[in-house]
Amino acid sequence: MRKITFYPHLAVTNVLRNNQFYLPYLLTNIATVAMFYILAYLSFDDTLASFPSANNVQVMMALGCIVVGIFSTILVFYTNSFVMKRRQHELGLYSILGMETRHIARLLRVEALFLGLFSLVCGLAAGIILSKLMLMLLFKLLHFPVSLGFSISIVGIAMTTVLFTVLFLLVLLHNLIQLHRAKPVELLRSSSVGEREPKVKWLLALVGVVTLVAGYVMANTIQSPLQALTLFFFAVILVIIGTYCIFTAGSIAVLKLLRANKHYYYKPQHFTTVSGLLYRMKQNAVGLASICILSTMLLVTVSTTVCLYLGVETSLKESFPRNINYTISLDEEQTAEDAVKTIEQAIKQTGHQAENVLSYTALSFPVVLSSSHELTLDGNAIRSTSIVSTVCVITQEDYNCYNTTPITLSKGQVACYSEGAELENNFQLGDQTFTIAQRLTDTPLPFYDAFRNLTNYVSIHYLVVPDEATLQELYQKETKALDTEDNTTRMADLTYTYCFDMDAADEELETFYNQLSPKFHTTYSYGCRQFISQEFYAIYGGFLFLGLFLGLLFLLGTVLIIYFKQISEGYDDQKRYEIMQKVGLSEREVRRSVHSQILLVFFLPLVTAMIHVFGAFHMITKLLQLFLYAKTMTTSFFLTCTLGTLAGFAVIYALVYWATAHTYYKIVRVKQADPRF
């Protein structure tokens, strides 16, 4: 009987005795299990699936499960490596006292069983309890009505159990392999084996500088949102490589320069810090770089998702200035007058009235912008090149209807607003010459043109022409000039946009749309602010929830890496600080040295992460334009969200610094002996 209970009793005793390491390890396991279950629960929740615009949200949650699963694997293995490093001396002592490798392996299996079961049970319990709260929070963000009731996802429990059972078995297998490879003497001496002084790897440092600069240049030279979307992944990879190389090679070079400065180095608070970090910088560098990358991921994820969600209302107002928006393609069969008549008849049948009507005709077509800034019209040339610009034309009458500052143009004159390359004051458009009488400060369209964010044009030129005749003349000429050889692609598009407000219930608006749609003979687009609002909040609310969720996971990883690294460093430094105190270093000097080291280890990754965020600011702003249809507020609004996220993260970071410095000091400090003995 005693033989049966020996290993369980010893396993529990070991965990309790090493609670300083196993408690954070268990909390990590419980937190990741709970977070994975919550996302799995949301991915399969029937209540959420019953809402028509929730499909994308559940896809996001499913993708979040994958991210949490991958990150949990990395985090659990990372924390386990620190725990096992601290236990190597203990396991070696067991071997010296007579326990064979198979006995120690059995002990590790029992410990893994207890830890795994405890983590799964507590994690699932926490996940089940919090899942309803998370669902209510998600519904609040999505502007869905919150429903009462409680449910448990059997699929979520099964997925979580399978994933983390496999993960804990892999961790156990890794520990057993390490045990069988090591010799008892090596385990006993592992904690006292020092690191060789690393050499400065100039090639690695050069690679770091080159990749980091390349990533920053790439992030700050892109012009269009689609270009930012294409290059974002490559820029991230370059910055990650550069960060690891700079921390690994650059930190060693800096420490050696500090050591060469005799005035700085030979001070008690600097001597112990610099010498200790220099000999263990290979491990420190990777840890610092990991903290930096995780902090950057957290800051970018939270700031962008907060910006997207808080900018929904502004996006709706700028993209849809009226409640209902129709844009109809015009041709011989469908004129603007026909479109207006059709819409007004449909409105009359509803018993409501159209209010705040806004309408205009617009012509858009692609052109090739030459080096001399001439606009060339050639359909075949446009199809064979990627260097294409686009032109959007409206009339002076339409422009003056919805702008407070009217303009007056003569024949051959235009008002112009360009994004990208500017046009000359006198420019050629096909066989016509135009003079720019006035340069506008913003697009002449009455609402934000979201389409321009989805194009890869090198430039966009908005022109205001004197009258309808000029616009129609341009349309006829451009249509003829842009005809392709196969004549299958319509490049010039003449559209009529009719926007209005109508005070009607959602059901009436849907009926209105269904009755009106078949009456148009050409291509058209329809937008209703109420319906679009539901879709916006469903998408951006899901983004925000997942962003905050992953931000919490990244924060957990950051704090744990910092904690375990600093605790491990504290135990490694304990003997050295004990010797320094015995030869005369005061407790105050020990505290100053600890403060100096913790400051370096903590705030270097934070400062570097902030630099990374602002280095990527231009690219992220361009990416946001793909989703946040409000050009006037994108940059300033994202800056506000970024600064707010930075401030909040810095406060949490400072609290972690205080707690870690206090724990580190308790480990390395040696209490003075009582003089009475």
Report residues per predicted region:
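Short helix-loop junctions at transmembrane helix boundaries
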Residues: 41-55, 124-156, 213-230, 605-673
